[in-house]
């Protein structure tokens, strides 16, 4: 293994899944949301722009289209136009129903926007972080 080329130089590992990897390239520049699995969670989306509509997509967690309607459609993406805002009450809290831990990506679903940096992570922990930043 010592003479094995680095992971990013292998032909089979040159796709988007590696180019977005915090393990290989460090965390993305935008702020990373952090929570513990099961924490109650709300995300406030505010589009302060004046030109383009975006499609906010959160992988894994879901919320109700109409917050106060228990019969409302459950979704994981929403279009947001200039000067709009939404509060997403995440069902079952951080980690969602299945208790997902680790990094959950959220991004604009319009690929040029995603590719140009309109994405970040929601990091969900399963154990207490002491703030030192050390990896196990």
Label each region the model flagged:
Residues 1-136:
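Copper-binding active sites and cupredoxin-like electron-transfer domains
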